Amino acid sequence: MTLFSSLLSRVSKDGKESIRGNYKPKKHPRGSSRHTMRKSLKKNLAGGTVLKESVKCPDGEDENEWIAVNTIEIFNTMNMCYSFIQGFCTEASCPQMTGAKATYLWTDGKGKPQELSAPQYIDNLVNWISEQIDNPEIFPVDDSDFPKNYRPAVIKIISRVLRVYAHIYHAHWDHIQKLDCYQHTNTSLKHLQYFAEHFSLIGEKDLAVMKHVFDTL
């Protein structure tokens, strides 16, 4: 049984959680360089390699490809962590998308920012990130060159993923602890932090939002 399956099994047995029905981790084509790099990343993480070391691009690998692998992995684990508490994150319990120091408004860059409940905001966000990752003009495939807007797109994805963690730690940390999922959630957030800092993919403003959490990890 995988770590993900084991955790979800434990959550389901508690009888209080519904798992994201649309949770489908992004995968890399078998045999591709990204598939190989992800196997290396997962092996290092599972083997206890220091997180700060595990996020560094391996010698001889393309840095942009490595960033793509980590970005997709971070997106997948964010989905997993949210799935733990999804049953508690409802329109009634979370009418706003809040963190410890902010209320986030949804915008797709086309209309005016609007206030949404946390579950609706996160559903919109997951769909938006999926579209970015699946867009070959942003995340190229078949050894195509990476476009100029690639790094800015990754920076935006990372900042938005961090908002989901901000909500989890602010509104649902008691649930995470009760379900005994806190170690995995903390490790997932640390992976994001070390990766984003190492490749300068996160600004001080975004880091400050979670500083009170980062300082305790």
UniProtKB/Swiss-Prot annotation:
Q: Per UniProt, which keywords does this protein have?
A: Metal-binding, Zinc
* Record's compositionally biased regions (Basic residues): 23-38
Alphabetical list of InterPro entries matching this protein: MOB_kinase_act_fam (IPR005301), MOB_kinase_act_sf (IPR036703)
Classification via SMART domains:
Mob1_phocein
What's in the GO CC field?
cytoplasm; nucleus
Single Gene Ontology BP annotation: signal transduction
* Organism domain of life: Eukaryota
Q: What is this protein called?
A: MOB kinase activator-like 2
Q: Which organism is it from?
A: Dictyostelium discoideum (Social amoeba)
